């Protein structure tokens, strides 16, 4: 992995991050004070598929997905188009494809400008509300980015047309990746704006949860610390949560992303992936996954974040 440089030195950024953390301020607030330039890029090189993690706005992520064999690339949720164009040029790749997870402005709001900057782009998404859409997709639709396979997974709940993108290299030994937008976060999930607890259960446990355990999870926002604080509240005896939280605080303090996680990891510390576990059900006062999902999401929406 290669980490890009920010505008502050490591010590200065660490001090600022630690100060924010002591006051209970999350990564989004660091973004407000410092802007996106102080959140570092990250290049994840697993083989043929490379993923450039591009911080955007205050806590969003865009992802440049590169096929190293053909030098063709796709961009996931390009809310800051010029930054996308610059990243593609830096890597010397041809941007051909836009993968939009959902229609919210902080994910799809850059589509119209990007198609003006880069002609001939194919814009994929599962919702007619997505700007500049050229290819509407449904559950299990497939497409290619160079030699990479992309499978579209419908995960309605956060929005009714939400799509996650599962990317793999046929015949390759490298782990696959899934770009989850606002359905699955590190240690969390998206709010149920246009769906139900039953739909989120299906999305997390039946659609995403059945992907290979080593699948890299690239989510839409940097919410990891606060998500883990809530997870700790739900399962105070869970050592995996404590360890991941300490790790995430260190990453945050130096401006580095906490993505990707893996699906296997999510099943150890994400309360929304653990709604079948007795410890989570007992905390919620429920006995089945759907009612537990509903109760835990309701509690998370009202949770007062501790300042540690």
From Swiss-Prot:
Q: Give the protein's cofactors.
A: Zn(2+)
Assembly information from the UniProt record: Monomer.
> Where are the N6-succinyllysine modifications?
229
Looking up NCBIfam families in the UniProt record yields:
GSH_gloB
What the entry lists under InterPro entries is as follows: Clx_II_MBL (IPR035680), HAGH_C (IPR032282), Hydroxyacylglutathione_Hdrlase (IPR017782), Metallo-B-lactamas (IPR001279), RibonucZ/Hydroxyglut_hydro (IPR036866)
What is this protein for, i.e. what is its function?
Thiolesterase that catalyzes the hydrolysis of S-D-lactoyl-glutathione to form glutathione and D-lactic acid.
Q: What span is annotated as transit peptide?
A: 1-13
User: What is this protein identified as?
Assistant: Hydroxyacylglutathione hydrolase, mitochondrial
Recorded metabolic or biological pathway in which this protein acts: Secondary metabolite metabolism; methylglyoxal degradation; (R)-lactate from methylglyoxal: step 2/2
Cite the binding residues for Zn(2+) 1: 102, 104, 158, 182
- One GO molecular-function annotation for this sequence? hydroxyacylglutathione hydrolase activity
Which SMART domains does the annotation name? Lactamase_B
């Amino acid at each position: 992995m290669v980490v890009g440089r920010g505008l502050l030195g490591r010590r200065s950024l660490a001090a600022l991050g630690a100060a924010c953390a002591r006051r209970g301020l999350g990564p989004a607030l660091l973004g407000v004070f410092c802007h996106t330039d102080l959140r570092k890029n990250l290049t994840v090189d697993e083989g043929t598929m490379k993923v450039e993690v591009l911080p955007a706005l205050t806590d969003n992520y865009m992802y440049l997905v590169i096929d190293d064999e053909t030098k063709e690339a796709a961009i996931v949720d390009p809310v800051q188009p010029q930054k996308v164009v610059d990243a593609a040029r830096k890597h010397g790749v041809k941007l051909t494809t836009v993968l939009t997870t959902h229609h919210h402005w902080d994910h799809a709001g850059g589509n119209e400008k990007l198609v003006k900057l880069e002609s001939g782009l194919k814009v994929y998404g599962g919702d007619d509300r997505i700007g500049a859409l050229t290819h509407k997709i449904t559950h299990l639709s497939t497409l290619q980015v160079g030699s990479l396979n992309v499978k579209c997974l419908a995960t309605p709940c956060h929005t009714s047309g939400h799509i996650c993108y599962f990317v793999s290299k046929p015949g390759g030994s490298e782990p696959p990746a899934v770009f989850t937008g606002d359905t699955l976060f590190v240690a969390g999930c998206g709010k149920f704006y246009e769906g139900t607890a039953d739909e989120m259960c299906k999305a997390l446990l039946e659609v995403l949860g059945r992907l290979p355990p080593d699948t890299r999870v690239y989510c839409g926002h940097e919410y990891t610390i606060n998500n883990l604080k809530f997870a700790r509240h739900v399962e105070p005896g869970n050592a995996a949560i404590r360890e991941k939280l300490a790790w995430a605080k260190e990453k945050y303090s130096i401006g580095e992303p906490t993505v990707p996680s893996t699906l296997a990891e999510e099943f150890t510390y994400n309360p929304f992936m653990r709604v079948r576990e007795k410890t989570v059900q007992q905390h919620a006062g429920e006995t089945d996954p759907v009612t537990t999902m509903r109760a835990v999401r309701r509690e998370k929406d009202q949770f007062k974040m501790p300042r540690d």
